[in-house]
Amino acid sequence: MNSANRKPLPGTKLDYFDARAAVEAIQPGAYDKLPYTSRVLAENLVRRCDPATLTDSLLQLVGRKRDLDFPWFPARVVCHDILGQTALVDLAGLRDAIADQGGDPAKVNPVVPVQLIVDHSLAVECGGFDPDAFAKNRAIEDRRNEDRFHFIDWTKQAFKNVDVIPPGNGIMHQINLEKMSPVIHADNGVAYPDTCVGTDSHTPHVDALGVIAIGVGGLEAENVMLGRASWMRLPDIVGVELTGKRQPGITATDIVLALTEFLRKEKVVGAYLEFRGEGASSLTLGDRATISNMAPEYGATAAMFFIDEQTIDYLRLTGRTDEQLKLVETYARTAGLWADSLKNAEYERVLKFDLSSVVRNMAGPSNPHKRLPTSALAERGIAVDLDKASAQEAEGLMPDGAVIIAAITSCTNTSNPRNVIAAALLARNANARGLARKPWVKSSLAPGSKAVELYLEEANLLPDLEKLGFGIVAFACTTCNGMSGALDPKIQQEIIDRDLYATAVLSGNRNFDGRIHPYAKQAFLASPPLVVAYAIAGTIRFDIEKDVLGTDQDGKPVYLKDIWPSDEEIDAIVAKSVKPEQFRKVYEPMFAITAASGESVSPLYDWRPQSTYIRRPPYWEGALAGERTLKALRPLAVLGDNITTDHLSPSNAIMLNSAAGEYLARMGLPEEDFNSYATHRGDHLTAQRATFANPTLINEMAVVDGQVKKGSLARIEPEGKVVRMWEAIETYMDRKQPLIIIAGADYGQGSSRDWAAKGVRLAGVEVIVAEGFERIHRTNLIGMGVLPLEFKPGVNRLTLGLDGTETYDVIGERQPRATLTLVVNRKNGERVEVPVTCRLDSDEEVSIYEAGGVLHFAQDFLESSRATA
């Protein structure tokens, strides 16, 4: 911590670092023109940056330059149990590597506070129509994840600065919003803004509080944990002016789905957005959080709202202390982070969005930014052939387009009391008119916070949700993360026998093909009340705005408009039923300081050799420790646009006929305990078999009878044999054949899944060439020592006529965004040289790549520190 520009914070006993004074010393009048993001980054620099480089770093912000890397020191790291656990497995492996070199393994410790929330490992095996669903699902979670939870328990004692919230307590982002983020820290006599990185792409959820919180991969998080700065160049900071007010009956979900479509078209990938204007100030904190949460879906790195009265009201509502409320307001007003202080902020680009233009929306199929107005269901070819579906139902069959999963799920929506109360009121109204859930619909309610249960009980609305089959099944990510659990065997068999087009409707944030359930061919995102309505309708062929949901006790038809609650009633019940004491009741015991057990544990983990969940990582051994030649590379896959991390390494249930399923069966696991791909990511032998295991993958090399065949397939060269992807990977591993992947635009979008990079690296991939990369996945690739290269505009796999029979070399000096040469050696002997951009974007990224990745970089750093100590 520096000493210059440290001053007393008025009205407190704390000091603060005066970023305004530091900026004004460089350029008078500049601070008032800085966006919110730049002001927070400036404070971070003034407090933490090496004084020798402080002025040059601040000039990047003041002059809006992008020609110098500057450091950012996040205050916290938040993790869920999948990437958080794999990060800690990596650190445990690093301890082993340090010990093998004669070093002290106990020196490997997080320096930055790490908060790990176990929220990703519960599957909805029992739906919300089972009154004992919560207890049953938790028991199954504990049984399946005993190895993982044993390791996580060890980390609490073996590592310093690691706090763990055990399973069954909520979703990391919602807990972060409602409790963990102080907005302003008070530490060692100094007040400063909260900032954090999280091992989940939806970490921007707390941007709604004015906290810079961004999603990173597990590998980048490990770097931050070990106390290293996160180096960056000034991002694009885009102002988004929200005008107007929403129409009656429009939810925050409708708004964010419309914004996601709008912002994707405006190409804000990688940008930090700042929502401002009268429309922004009128939104509740819950509505803001819904918008900030989906930053990765519209491609932004951050989605900031300013600190204002809405922020203070929310902090009060969620049980923060009066002292903390005063600190947040005092600091924000003093440091220029209060909304009124941002009126003169200048942006290089400003977008405008009218909230009054938003209609009732869904998204789908297949992509969150594919907005689907409910008024256009018929014209889009979704709500068609209802007569056919109704006839099938009358014959005792499931209808075409059957909604087999209807889930109120995800931090995106269950952290917003208006959305949850709206769903409960619609359920109450539906029950009053005699409507019911269709029997083939697996319905569930999985709030991200235990406070949701308390305010639903306070409003006496939980019984109405339970009556329609939306009882609470968990406080966890569940269906949104692909953990929707098994279907009723009879329903599943009917889907298989009839090759039925079945769907899912969920209040989640992603609906990529194959993500939600293997037998839900497509999925649609919708607000919580619409999810309830579709459970009643039972088929996506139903025109939710126009068709009759059912008939009441008097034989009268019931339409959606008849049971949709009014805004006035929703707001009245929220105001009456959501109370600070509910949040205190939930979080005070959860975060109570418990006495240390007194038990000491070894600094080295005792790996269980038969475990399929936790295994010593291999990153310091064998081929991964060897040289990457970047020569004679063969393509593992040639891919199109929009390849997601779900394509690269899926999270959902493991099927018996998959490579991972066959491996688990050989290891003695019964099929019902295979669990999900996500839960096995601490064991590389299981997790690497998930690489490209998505059945919806389209690898353009997998040509069978003249047609590209969909599935987890690859073509072994030079034989030209199309086989299962894992068979190709094993073949190339045996041959020690270095590999390359060729892809289209937006490669790696979706979850911040480090195994999407680890899997391809373990397969032998050294290079990925694409038309564009999503930010988090690109940094994960670098963190694993995989070189990301980008085609120049107008050049791609199609213009070059690439078919996978080629071999490739990469020539040139690897420097930030340098032009390198991709040499294409065609089968006919022709040699083509293609200029490509090296997507190592900073000197730090070059250093990490050249070291072989984050873990080798960290090992070198720790060993050099030991040598000079």
From Swiss-Prot:
EC number: 4.2.1.3, 4.2.1.99
Keywords: 4Fe-4S, Iron, Iron-sulfur, Lyase, Metal-binding, RNA-binding, Tricarboxylic acid cycle
Cofactor(s) this protein cannot do without: [4Fe-4S] cluster
Family: Belongs to the aconitase/IPM isomerase family.
Pathway: Carbohydrate metabolism; tricarboxylic acid cycle; isocitrate from oxaloacetate: step 2/2; Organic acid metabolism; propanoate degradation
InterPro entries (UniProt xref): 2Me_IsoCit_deHydtase_FeS-dep (IPR012708), Acnase/IPM_dHydase_lsu_aba_1/3 (IPR015931), Acoase/IPM_deHydtase_lsu_aba (IPR001030), Aconitase/3IPM_dehydase_swvl (IPR015928), Aconitase/IRP2 (IPR006249), Aconitase_4Fe-4S_dom (IPR036008), AconitaseA/IPMdHydase_ssu_swvl (IPR000573)
Top-level taxon of the source organism: Bacteria
The organism of origin for this protein: Cupriavidus necator
Pfam families (UniProt xref): Aconitase (PF00330), Aconitase_C (PF00694)
Functional description taken from the UniProt entry: Involved in the catabolism of short chain fatty acids (SCFA) via the tricarboxylic acid (TCA)(acetyl degradation route) and the 2-methylcitrate cycle I (propionate degradation route). Catalyzes the reversible isomerization of citrate to isocitrate via cis-aconitate. Could catalyze the hydration of 2-methyl-cis-aconitate to yield (2S,3R)-2-methylisocitrate. The apo form of AcnA functions as a RNA-binding regulatory protein.
Assembly description: Monomer.
Gene Ontology MF, one: mRNA 3'-UTR binding
Catalytic activity: citrate = D-threo-isocitrate; (2S,3R)-3-hydroxybutane-1,2,3-tricarboxylate = 2-methyl-cis-aconitate + H2O
Residues that coordinate or bind [4Fe-4S] cluster: 411, 477, 480
Name of the protein in question: Aconitate hydratase A
Broad enzyme group: lyase
GO BP terms: propionate metabolic process, methylcitrate cycle; tricarboxylic acid cycle
Cross-referenced PANTHER family: ACONITASE/IRON-RESPONSIVE ELEMENT FAMILY MEMBER
Annotated cofactor note: Binds 1 [4Fe-4S] cluster per subunit.
